Amino acid sequence: MPFYLYGMSASSSAITLSGIFIYPVKSLGGISLPAAELTPRGLRHDRRWLIVDARNRFMTQREHAEMALLAVEPAYNGFLLRHRQRPELLPLYMPFEAQPDKTLFVTIWDDMVWAWRGTPEADAWLSEALGQPCKLVYMSDMVRRDVEPDKPELNPAGTVVSFADGYPYLLATEESLAKLNAQLEEPVPMNRFRPNLVVSGALADAELSWAGFSIAGQPFRSVRGCGRCIVTTIDQATAQQNPAGEPLRTLATYRKPDRKVLFGQNVTGPASGRIEVGDAVVLG
């Protein structure tokens, strides 16, 4: 029988940080890190780049599953974009941080913020890779995008966020994934859920009830469970959507309070610091 730490209290086992991930470009692949710096917007270099369409509106795998075919690989002071199925498209190098250049207003959900333009080469590469006109833009430190601007009770500290959907950090546990996979005909990897912080040693599903925790002594605040969408059904290696709607369909059978299918926890954290894989996670 799979081991989910059932019957144990969270305090009776050591909870540790087992994975750290950044996604330099929103809705593209992630990079696994052994350690990361904390910033006011989340992990350093996480979701600071964004792909927008001809109307300067954000693009994600929700409407463009083919974005999963654009792999992101670490490179010196930046990353490479590589198309998994089109080797004739030479990899594109991008720095983690853009240089000040032309600006434009872009829309992400209900927010309109200004961003720096990337490069003509990046725009051309992405337009060819995705089969439609698009641009790559960067969020400067001078841009303010507040977490939950219409719900200040969820953001008492005035936390800001990058181009992430809503919060600086997304946390998931290995045990919750193991519990889900035990119910699936075809198990799914953690990359379906795009977390920043992965922990092990917790009770399955327990993260949804955490009020707060610390990593290496640095405080984080759990805000609310993360409502999941169709992206979880997209194979991140092939861009093919699961015809049965899995794993979302199975998750909905036991993790659907208030009409939202939840997996993982939205989190805010300190404005500075450093975390490493293997760090202790302490609840409370």
Language-model features: locations:
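Metal-cofactor-dependent catalytic cores
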Residues: 2-284
